[in-house]
């Protein structure tokens, strides 16, 4: 059975998600939408927005992978250090 996440943590995660979503939306909108003379979204604006989102997702994934690699290295270093400290001389 999966552990339940406390409600306060769920709220915090949701607020962080909304903050990230809002920032991404604003960034891509400001970069991609330039013409307000029509109610329709132009194809180049759609393409730009899609590329902006894809770039952000790839960046987020890459940072996550690098963070995991760094965390693993730190854990291995701590384990090695603990192993050395635990051995008699």
Swiss-Prot record:
UniProt signal peptide: none
Pfam families (alphabetical): zf-Tim10_DDP (PF02953)
One BP annotation, GO: protein insertion into mitochondrial inner membrane
Membrane topology classification: Peripheral membrane protein
Alphabetic keyword roster: Acetylation, Chaperone, Disulfide bond, Membrane, Metal-binding, Mitochondrion, Mitochondrion inner membrane, Protein transport, Translocation, Transport, Zinc
Cellular compartments annotated: Mitochondrion inner membrane
UniProt entry tagged with the keyword Metal-binding: yes
InterPro entries reported for this sequence: Mito_inner_translocase_sub, Tim10-like, Tim10-like_dom_sf
S-S bonds: 28-52, 32-48
PANTHER family linked to this entry: MITOCHONDRIAL IMPORT INNER MEMBRANE TRANSLOCASE SUBUNIT TIM9B
Function: Mitochondrial intermembrane chaperone that participates in the import and insertion of multi-pass transmembrane proteins into the mitochondrial inner membrane. May also be required for the transfer of beta-barrel precursors from the TOM complex to the sorting and assembly machinery (SAM complex) of the outer membrane. Acts as a chaperone-like protein that protects the hydrophobic precursors from aggregation and guide them through the mitochondrial intermembrane space.
Name under which the protein is recorded: Mitochondrial import inner membrane translocase subunit Tim9
Source species of the chain: Mus musculus (Mouse)
The gene coding this protein: Timm9
